[in-house]
Amino acid sequence: MATKNRTIIKKYADRWHKEACHLYAKWLNAKRQGDEEAANYYFSKYITAGDNWINYTKFAH
């Protein structure tokens, strides 16, 4: 049972990692275009996704 739970948690960690990478790219694109409002929005979402990724990664090991 523990292995199954660990696999599920790892799947969520992988999803959050993918989401964090996607949001980082959106933030970088907004910064390059000079859209500070969008950049701030994507940065805050990126930080949240990164925190979730770190938390799920801790539980996966």
UniProtKB/Swiss-Prot annotation:
Protein name per Swiss-Prot or TrEMBL: Uncharacterized 7.3 kDa protein in cox-rep intergenic region
Native source species: Haemophilus phage HP1 (strain HP1c1) (Bacteriophage HP1)
